[in-house]
Structures are given as C-alpha cells and as structure tokens.
C-alpha cells in the first residue's frame, strides 16, 4: 500500500474526528447566524451561544447538535484528497526547485488555490448540512421539512435542479479562498518556528496541536463575515435572494448592521482548538497503527501533513 494512500486514509480518520468533535459548535454557529431578526418588543430567538445550546438540547435533545453531520462525514476523505492536491499544485506552480522552501506568501497562494478546489466538492455538503442544522423540532410551519441528507438532495433538485444544490458557490469561494490562504501560511510558518533550526527539525505533539489550533483561529478570523452570508444564502427559501450574496449583504447591513456579519464568532473560536486537536489525534493514531503493524513504508508523520482548515 503506497504512503500516499496511507496518508490519505489517516487524513480521513483525522478529518472524521474533527467533524465529530466540532459539529455541535458548528450547529450552534449556523443557528445563531441564520436566526431571524426579532420584531419590535420581541426577544431574539437565542441570546447567545450558551442559550442556543440550552434551548436546542431542551427542545430537541442532545443529538440535535449533530444534525446534518452525515454530509461532512461522508465528504471528509475526498475533501482531504482535493485539499492536499490543491496545496501540492499550488506549491509546484511556484517552485523553481523541488527542495525549495516556500515563503509565507507562497504558502498563502497555495492555500488559496486549494480553497478553490475544495469549494467544488464542499458546496453541496455545506448546503445539505446547513438546511438540516437550522431545521428545528416543531417547526413544520416554517418551511420545507427534510427527513435526512438524501431527502434534502431530492427536494432541492426538484425545486431548482443542480443549481439549487450548488447554491452558495460564490459565497463559499469568498469564504474559503482567504481562509485557506491564512490557514496554510500560518500553519507552515508556526511549524517552522516551533521546530527550531537545523537539518533535523522536529515538532513535538504539543507544538503540532498549538500550530494547528492557532492556524484554525487565523482561518476563521478572516472568513466569518463570508460564512454568515453563505449560511443565510444557503438556508433561505427558494427565490428570496435572486442576486445571490449581494442581496444577502444588503439585507444584513440594512436591517442588522455590520456587527451581524460576525454572528457565531464565539462558537467558531471555541471549536478551533478541540477540533484541530481531534484531527491530529486521529491522524497520529492511524499513522502509528500503520507503523506498528508494518503496513506500507514510512507514512509521513503529521508534522508534514496539513490538516483541512474546514472540517465541514
């Protein structure tokens, strides 16, 4: 079994761990981002992240926090493959020599290209995930009811064909290009800083987790406004925003102001470290198992593997 395949499998395990740990935070984020503006005299649907968790669990049960998880879980391995491929192509296009070390800007360029590639795979899963996440128990009168991921695909296709399934592509590009650029450049920069100088640079597990966690924060720090617009566009009724993300932006700024573009900030930041820690734990454990059982040659340790910036 080739080392490329082994690293792909390990990456898939790491990505799955990320989804499982991070999805409840993501559900809270999406619900806060998409909650309707309260009418004069009315209280908001959720007063914050903790209130969203309490209300969701009390009304729908604990596993409501995992609504829509199937789509990112199924897509995480191919997403890793596309992301790694995009990074490799981005680096190859800029290198004059295979051993050339990439600069901060070059890594950002490679990450940006990878963000374009992953969007193609990511959009349908994001659309399905968001629609299931905002669907609440006892809300049959609020719109279309979905019984699961396949039912979402079937109903979206019936409503508007493939274009409905891929709604939010532009918004996802607006989110993932700068986010992936920030993630890869910060991760590679911190990896070099933490591993020291010399030919035998090594990175401890703790430093690896720190680099991944800080890179995750950098990733989300630059893309939350675009993520808010994407979530609203992908969960809106058919035909509400005929001019796409521009219509969402105008409505948000007109009705709620610029601060609304940062809704869901704390759930996103709170999930950055545990989600990345879970990713590296799954990655390391799988690679260690391959080495223990003598499978393949020498699969690349996680210090050389770049985890995905977006688990879902």
Swiss-Prot record:
> Can you provide one Gene Ontology molecular function annotated for this UniProt record?
ATP:ADP antiporter activity
Question: Has UniProt tagged this entry with the keyword Nucleotidyltransferase?
Answer: no
| Residue pairs linked by disulfide bridges in the UniProt entry | none
Query: Cross-referenced PROSITE patterns, in alphabetical order?
Result: SOLCAR
Recorded GO CC terms: mitochondrial envelope; mitochondrial inner membrane
Cellular location(s):
Mitochondrion inner membrane
InterPro entries assigned to the protein according to its UniProt record, in alphabetical order: ADT_euk_type, Mitochondrial_Carrier, Mitochondrial_sb/sol_carrier, Mt_carrier_dom_sf
Q: Which Pfam families match?
A: Mito_carr
**Record family assignment:** Belongs to the mitochondrial carrier (TC 2.A.29) family.
Q: What is this protein called?
A: Protein dif-1
Q: Which organism is it from?
A: Caenorhabditis elegans
What gene is this protein translated from? dif-1
């Amino acid at each position: 079994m080739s080392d490329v395949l082994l690293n792909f499998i390990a990456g898939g395990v790491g990505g799955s761990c990320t989804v499982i740990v991070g999805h409840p935070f993501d559900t809270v984020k999406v619900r806060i981002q998409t909650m309707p503006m309260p009418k004069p005299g009315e209280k908001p649907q959720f007063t914050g992240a903790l209130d969203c968790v309490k209300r969701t669990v009390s009304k729908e049960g604990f596993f409501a926090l995992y609504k829509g998880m199937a789509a990112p879980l199924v897509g995480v391995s191919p997403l890793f493959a596309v992301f790694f491929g995009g990074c490799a192509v981005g680096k190859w296009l800029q290198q004059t020599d295979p051993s050339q070390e990439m600069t901060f800007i070059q890594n950002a360029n490679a990450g940006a290209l990878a963000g374009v590639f992953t969007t193609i795979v990511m959009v349908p899963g994001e659309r399905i995930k968001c629609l299931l996440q905002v669907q609440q128990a006892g809300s049959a009168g609020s719109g279309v009811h979905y019984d699961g991921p396949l039912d979402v695909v079937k109903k979206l296709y019936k409503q508007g064909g493939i274009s409905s399934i891929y709604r939010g592509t532009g918004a996802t590009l607006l989110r993932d290009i700068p986010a992936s650029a920030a993630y890869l450049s910060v991760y590679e920069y911190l990896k070099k800083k933490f591993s020291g100088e010399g030919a035998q640079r090594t990175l401890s597990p703790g430093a690896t987790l720190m680099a991944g966690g800080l890179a995750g924060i950098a990733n989300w720090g630059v893309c939350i406004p675009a993520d808010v617009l994407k979530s609203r566009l992908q969960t809106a009724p058919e035909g509400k925003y005929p001019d796409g993300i521009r219509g969402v932006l105008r409505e948000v700024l007109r009705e709620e102001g610029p601060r609304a573009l940062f809704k869901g900030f704390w759930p996103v930041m709170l999930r950055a470290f545990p989600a990345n820690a879970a990713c590296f734990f799954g990655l390391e454990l799988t690679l260690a198992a391959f080495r223990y059982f003598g499978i393949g040659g020498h699969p690349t340790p996680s210090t050389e593997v770049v985890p995905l910036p977006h688990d879902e």
